[in-house]
């Protein structure tokens, strides 16, 4: 088999890495710089209104509340105009993200199927080996359980110091039959 580990459907594949949240934030700030500007203006107006309220300056307080309303209106207009302006680009980006997600899910599905095929092949190989041992045992007149006991005994015999050349499963079964 290959040196690579079996693929798993739970693996995350860095090949399909999209933009992280910071890159997305930077991109959105470049696309619509007026929205953060409006948010900053609103926050500044609220902060100044708070300072005016603490100082007891009601004229400045009222003026800052009006500026806050203007800044919020500016932010709202920036959101609406930006939404209209970037509508087609957002639709294209959404379609691209959908295609990337579909490609990623297809790749995961393919990896999962490959993993299942490999495991299925290993299972078939094991069953074939097991069937060959059973056939050899039937030919020799032994029960399959006796074969496994005999093989376990032979491996114990090998550990005790019996030096034998490469003995296959069939040879081991034949040797067991000859010994009886």
From Swiss-Prot:
Keywords: Coiled coil, Membrane, Mitochondrion, Transmembrane, Transmembrane helix. Residues 84-111 form a coiled coil. Pfam families: HIG_1_N. It is a multi-pass membrane protein. Disulfide bonds: none annotated. The keyword Coiled coil applies. The chain crosses the membrane at residues 34-50, 69-86. InterPro entries: Hypoxia_induced_domain, RCF1. It is found in: Mitochondrion membrane. Residues 135-148 have a biased composition (Basic and acidic residues). Residues 135-165 are annotated as: Disordered. GO terms for cellular component: mitochondrial membrane. GO terms for biological process: mitochondrial respirasome assembly. PANTHER family: HIG1 DOMAIN FAMILY MEMBER 1A, HYPOXIA-INDUCBILE GENE 1 HIG1 -RELATED. Cytochrome c oxidase subunit which plays a role in assembly of respiratory supercomplexes. Belongs to the RCF1 family. Associates with the respiratory chain complex III/complex IV supercomplex. This is Respiratory supercomplex factor 1, mitochondrial. It comes from Coccidioides posadasii (strain C735) (Valley fever fungus).
């Amino acid at each position: 088999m290959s040196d690579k580990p079996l693929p798993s459907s739970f693996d995350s594949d860095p090949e399909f890495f999209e933009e992280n949240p910071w890159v997305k934030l930077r991109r959105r700030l470049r696309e619509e710089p007026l929205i953060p500007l409006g948010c900053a203006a609103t926050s500044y107006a609220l902060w100044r209104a708070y300072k005016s309220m603490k100082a007891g300056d009601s004229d400045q307080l009222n003026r800052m509340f009006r500026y806050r309303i203007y800044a919020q209106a500016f932010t709202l207009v920036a959101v609406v105009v930006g939404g209209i302006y970037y509508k087609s680009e957002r639709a294209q980006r959404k379609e691209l993200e959908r295609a990337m997600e579909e490609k990623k899910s297809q790749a995961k599905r393919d990896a999962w199927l490959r993993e299942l095929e490999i495991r299925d092949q290993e299972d078939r190989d094991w069953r074939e080996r097991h069937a060959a041992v059973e056939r050899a045992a039937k030919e020799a007149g032994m029960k399959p359980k006796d074969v496994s006991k005999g093989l376990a005994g032979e491996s114990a015999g090998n550990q005790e110091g019996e030096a034998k050349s490469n003995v296959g499963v069939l040879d081991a079964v034949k040797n067991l039959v000859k010994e009886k």
